Amino acid sequence: MSSKTAYTELFVSRYQPVEKGKRWAWVLIRTVLVVGFCFIILFPLFQRLSIAFRSKADIYDPTVLWIPRNFTFDNLRIAIETTNYFEALGNTALISASTTLIQLVSCALAAYAFARLQFRGSGLLFGLVIVTIIVPPQTIMIPLYLTYRYFDLFGLVGLFSSKDSLNLIDTFWPFILSSSTAMGLKNGLYIYIFRQFFRGIPKEIGEAALVDGAGVFRTFLRIMVPNAVPAIVTVLLFSFVWQWNDSYYVSLFLKQVKVLSTSLMDMGVGLREPDPVYTSMLLNTGVLLAIAPLILMYLFVQRYFVESVERTGIVG
């Protein structure tokens, strides 16, 4: 055996344990991180699930940790009655579903224009889209409210009616109009997601469609939309969840209409419970009822959501 061969075998014999140790260390680190993140996310959910079925006596029983001793549905009943749960659930689902579908169309069209159509000022306009992501919506709260409180589309309302303007507050129209113009909740982010995905589609595909006689809209519908399914799923889920949990716009535009987010904010006043600990338990039950539909939805679409996030490159 030559000295070179002996040296190689010695190096390999020493190198393999080191690599194996690094591999096991990386597995341990990943396991700790995954378990830690799961604990952070799932602990509040399991805690609220346990609280929802406890009786008032279980609150002050130090032996009750997770499993209720006096199992009851009273907390759920009180939370449902106080929040007008089913009415609020229907309104929330209607607003979330309608605005999500409208935003999907308007943001995709706007993003397609930024990604494929060359026109003067496109860079400036896209920069303004990015600004809408950065600037908090609270800074334009008063203009937004006044726009829909005294709505007048270029003076056309006065031409066709005796009123100078329309009051769209306490209706769904502010959500529909803002979503139709790609100015709704988080629409700047959705335009950015679609634009980046459309830019990743080879230009040759669109050019071939134009050569075959397809126009801009036909190319968008026949070429871009079928290839943008991952981006569509991502925007669909993000838009629905954000709209479901929104409390800013609904409290600004809907004063009398019941939705889940505002019902939860008013729940503490409606309970009139002198015991603050029991009030907190009922509020936690209300939160659980509000997020339950989202959890059920995620259980059915989680595979599509993970695939879409991986393909669009959305992280964080």
Label for each model-derived stretch:
Residues 4-12, 18-22, 26-316:
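A structural signal for multi-pass alpha-helical bundles of membrane permease subunits
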